[in-house]
Amino acid sequence: VPANEAGVTRNALNNIDRTRGLAELLFDGATAIPLGSVGGAATAIRKTIDAGRVALAADNLGAAQRMIEKTVVYSLERKQFNRPIGSFQGYKHMCAEMAAELEPSRSLVWYAAHCQSEIPNEASVMACHAKAHLAEVCTEIANKATLGHGGMGFTDLMGVHYWFKRIGYNRQILGGPEAVRADAAALQGLVPA
């Protein structure tokens, strides 16, 4: 349905991620044109959801990487007891743990994206795994990175809260980790669909 079609109403919605718009679409008598064969929508919808889940996983990967980078830079600039806080062992460990948690996720996102065009029989399950795993790993990194900035991490001054909110938003769009894992289990025949 073209967006300017008569009978289509678009209402902007507020959401936690102010860097991304969100809208509700209402259809009242709008003329729809089938994009595929009648009854063949399930496959097109599945592929669209899979692509969206992989894109959200990749977006989370980039957001978490940026939060780690900003935390490391902050640790070298912020001083406590006349030395950078990044020189303290506990802070070093926190940064190293964030990087170690994120690094294996790169391969998972790459493989899930690769499956979308090259290994279609694995595409849906891998999209689910990437979305669920990145949602959880990146939420943990977002929490640590925000705390690593102290009270400043919760303000507009440092900018990490934008990434924190984006990761939280991405976590729920197209299914939270629990729902996406349930979808993966159903796709693999482990539970009833």
Where are these regions (language model features)?
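Buried hydrophobic positions in well-ordered alpha/beta secondary-structure cores of metabolic enzymes
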Residues: 25-27, 64, 95, 105, ...
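Glycine-rich phosphate/cofactor-binding loops in nucleotide/flavin-utilizing enzymes
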Residues: 151-193
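A glycine-biased, small/acidic residue-tolerant capping/turn segment at secondary-structure junctions
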Residues: 114-116, 122, 138-164
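C-terminal helix-coil-helix/basic helical segment that borders enzyme active sites and/or dimer interfaces
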Residues: 72-83, 99-133, 146-149, 185-193
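FAD-binding core of flavoproteins
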Residues: 1-69, 73, 83, 178, ...
